[in-house]
């Protein structure tokens, strides 16, 4: 499958990624465990995402959530303005993949988007411990620290 666009912005790319995911789901089907997880989170909300996942994993041992799948799902929710559900998915991703710098970087980004600078800084720092070459974390961390310094100095 090839999707093309004449626009080169993050929103168009994200929309195409969401469209591609929907096409793959429609073509290949969605595993029962993943269907159950999506339904449970829609019905109960995302606040207990980790607990819901753990319970459904017992009922559906085949349920597997890849790191990039959760990350893409979280960013999709974030693009839709659903910050709290995105936050809960990124927390789940950190829980499932604690050795991944990317999971902490993504969690930091959603904390930053919700205005929780302290948690963003903490998670960017954790990401940098795991991957010292993470330029995204370095740039965001510098901005957050500078903003905090300015606001503390006023």
Which residues make up each language-model segment?
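Catalytic loop of the DD-peptidase/beta-lactamase superfamily, centered on the K-T-G motif
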Residues: 1-48
């Amino acid at each position: 499958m090839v999707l093309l666009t004449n626009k080169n912005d993050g929103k168009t790319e994200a929309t195409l990624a969401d469209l591609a995911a929907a096409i793959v789901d429609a073509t290949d089907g969605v595993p029962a465990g993943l269907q159950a997880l999506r339904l449970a989170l829609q019905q109960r909300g995302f606040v207990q995402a980790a607990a819901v996942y753990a319970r459904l994993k017992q009922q559906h041992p085949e349920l597997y959530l890849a790191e990039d799948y959760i990350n893409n799902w979280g960013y999709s929710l974030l693009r839709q303005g659903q910050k709290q559900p995105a936050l809960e998915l990124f927390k789940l991703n950190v829980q499932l993949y604690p050795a991944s710098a990317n999971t902490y970087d993504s969690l930091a980004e959603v904390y930053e988007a919700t205005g929780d600078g302290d948690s963003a800084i903490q998670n960017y720092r954790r990401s940098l411990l795991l991957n010292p070459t993470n330029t995204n974390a370095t740039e965001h961390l510098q901005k957050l620290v500078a903003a905090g310094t300015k606001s503390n100095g006023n």
